[in-house]
Amino acid sequence: MPHSFPDYSFTCPFCKNNCKLSFAQCPAFCPFCGKSQKNESTGLPIQSDFYQIIKSIGKGGMGEVFLAYDPCYERQIAIKKIRSDLLEHPQIKKRFLKEAHMTSQLTHPAIIPIYTIRSDADTAYYTMPFVEGDTLKQIIRKTKLQEKNGETLDYLGGSILALMRVFITICQAVAYAHSKGVLHRDLKPENIIIGKYGEVLILDWGLAKFIDQSPEEELLASFPESLTKQKDITKIGKVVGTVAYMAPERALGQPATIQTDIYSLGVILYQLLTLKSPFKRGTLDEFRKNMSREEWQDPVTAAPYREVPRMLASFTEKCLSLDLQNRYQSVEELIRDIENYLEGRSEWFCIANLNTKEKNDWEFQENVLIAEHVAITRMTDDAEWVSLMISKQSFTGNTKIEADVCLGEQGHGIGFLLSVPEASAREHLIEGYCLWLGSDFSKTTKLLRSNVEVVHAPDIFLKRQQTYHVRIEKVDKSIHVYINDNLQFSYIAHIPLIGTHVGLLSRDADFEISPLEIYVGNLNINVNCLAVPDAFLAHRDYNQALSEYRRIAYSFPDRTEGREALFRAGLTFLEQAKTAENKMPLLEEALNEFEKLHGTPSAPLEYLGKALAYESINDSEEEIKCYELAYRRYPNHPILPMLQEQIISRLHEVSRMQRITTYRFTLLTVRHLPLNKIDTHTKRLFNSLQKHWEVLPFIEYKSPSPLTTLSTRFATPLAFWLAKPFILGEILDDLIQSPPFPIEEVNNALLCLVELGSWEYAQEKLNTIQTYLNLPQNPKWLDLKAFIACHYQTLEDVYKDFFFQIPSTNADHLHAVLYFMDQCLDQLNTSLIYTLARQFEHAELSFEDRLRLNCRRVWAYLLDKNWQDAGNLLYTYSVETLNKDSSLLHFLYGCWLQVTEGAEIANVHFAGVNPVMFPRTWTLGARFLTNNLSKDSYEKAFMWEKRQLCKQLILYYHCVGNETKRIHFQKLYQEQFIHAEL
């Protein structure tokens, strides 16, 4: 034992005085206080080994529980000792000690802990805390008597809500024991004690067993005849447990399971609700005989004055179901239902059945083509036909959808729609939420919000040719998805959707589905203070909603609800502005409301709100600035996931119609959102963007790393297309901090700066890199210096300094050569172009590189109006190549035809360009000259595209001799540069 006292040591449990005795026996009276040292009821001596027994507090079949004093720790404890007449029976003793050992392995606040265990030839006992209080049985009995006598009810027994808090603690302890593989097998109110200070403890684990434990012996070899007559000892080999709390299948000899413990919990729950047992049972044999005649009485009718909630009555009935399939499968399921009750949620009411075969149930029932990312693609390669059905009836508040689904052999899945807006408010076909349940053929289960993936769950799928019960619950801002009554995942929506319709979506017809059962549960006992103004907002009562939001914000300035109310007050103005003739005053009011969140713990909501305000007036640039400010000022704020969800949603939304805005949101996403939070749906959008954008000729990647890694390789061209030199500067700063030094990425970012016109900024960045990193000279730096030198030296000097001594066979510096040639064309210095062309005449160039070099030569000939040499060089290529709009020579050949063959032939040639939504830059001039490029298209073009168009038209009008238009486009050309400086 961990502590020991000699036999002659004595401590009085009453006055706590200690002395040493010259004899081993406990004295009859304390020599200090004079109190008797014998138990008045049993006459037993107070001293027991190392503890002083004070009194007996309970008896059972195998043992007795005493209140005792532990002198080592100076505390009162409870000792459970085996009956002395049972010590001689090894199996009884073993069973007694098994309870102690099994309980000691369970560590839970609601399971009584074990202090010590002792067993020898003379005794067997274990110690545990002494808890002052009443058993649940005593509380039920006392409350029932008070009710009968018309007295004031016990504070606990008289409150079903308080009893449910106790019950859920019991359930949590049992669930914990089950998780450790232990069954209690004797759950009943007398084994549960409620402490003086609210402690809830499950006692008496004497019948507990491990779930996977082998069956006990059927018979006890030497079971004494004297014990067989004692009813208070459960016989080994017999069905163990208390009949009143025993599951029917257990009484019939089936082994104990988790569901038999759940049945016992159901009986306890029934007693807590009604103060009476659900069934009258006698002995085990009588129970077996009368089992089929037991009648269920609903707790609501069994105790009409207790006002038993129907929800709790239904939980009780499910616990006590004779059909194991209908009984709770785990205690966790019961806990979830009890928690729903404690949170005040009402029960669901079925108000509609929507049959896919009944046309009158559906407002919209068509096959539609869903195309994604149209704003950034040249063809609808991300499009598919789907069958779409939207309910005619609307469902407000909390909504639940239930249906049985069976996918066929070729079925890919089924989609459930909810929170779909009214037809007049739908900007796109699929709005609201869509739960797509994929089959085992595709495994693409996901939850989408306005066609944007917010949950990706590939491990959840429906096996083909099997029927599943699907349940979707939308409660407040949460969506819970169940399959066969098992929760699969939950999702919390940060920005509410107000839609009230439901629907179905399918990619094929290979499925069977039962009519959709639609439930609503609008009432909630514990109403969130925001629910009231939310309801006003949903019904467009803006003034009342605003008044309530402001009142909540004023009342709870330091709580999340108060700050959320400020945010929603701003949203109220935005909703009101949607239908107002004069929006601007309302938008100003919204911005003022969002401004109040500045400096609070919910500060990012200020920028989210302002972004929503700018979105409402289609000012995407200011909208994105708000998101950038939020991420820059609060990079690790816990509210940022709300902004992230909105950013991703907006990215997919604008990808349908707005190309430049899509690029802006993509750059924002790549630069600020965590890479591991980018979902597969968004990555697919990035892949589509990369596939369809024009490859910039001055960006070079020799390593195989793909752009879709969302690294700077993706951000750099995005920043260039959007003409964002300072973001390129930030990218460079990030690259410098990324060892090993990524020379290729740094060079590309610097070249982008030069091409934008920010060559001074590029020079300063290059100087910083070389000064602080002390890098060795690199051939790429030489090319970059040549790029920059074109802007502050004469072209002749640049040629002498950088290109004069380049070996004629060396093509490594071709990028710099081509850039230098472009500068010569801009300054009409064609002689240097001819010189460089001769210098590289015998260089080993690829077909594409030779083509780009020859394009500059043809351009120079056309500037010099040297039609002969221009034609000779053009006709070194086939007519088929010259007529292809995919060739860089296409526009140059058209200019040559204009001056040599006439306008009619040239127009036919220019008109041969393919009609695509976003043409390549080298076809822009041809489209403009054939009136296939609108002024609106020009306004929506990127700066680089405008520059290339102007450059082509400068050449064309130079060739035809229209000096006025040439000068006009020359001025426009000069405007397409950004001269950023540090």
From Swiss-Prot:
EC number: 2.7.11.1
UniProt keyword list: ATP-binding, Kinase, Nucleotide-binding, Phosphoprotein, Serine/threonine-protein kinase, Transferase
Domain Protein kinase per the UniProt entry, residue ranges: 51-342
Residues that coordinate or bind ATP: I57, G58, K59, G60, G61, M62, G63, E64, V65, K80
Pfam families xref list: Pkinase
GO molecular function, one term: protein serine kinase activity
UniProt catalytic activity: L-seryl-[protein] + ATP = O-phospho-L-seryl-[protein] + ADP + H(+); L-threonyl-[protein] + ATP = O-phospho-L-threonyl-[protein] + ADP + H(+)
Top-level class of the enzyme under EC nomenclature: transferase
Keyword ATP-binding: yes
Post-translational modification: Autophosphorylated on serine and threonine residues.
HAMAP family (UniProt xref): PknD_kinase (MF_01957)
Role description: Together with the serine/threonine kinase Pkn1, may play a role in the specific interactions with host proteins during intracellular growth.
Family in the record: Belongs to the protein kinase superfamily. Ser/Thr protein kinase family.
Name of the protein this chain belongs to: Serine/threonine-protein kinase PknD
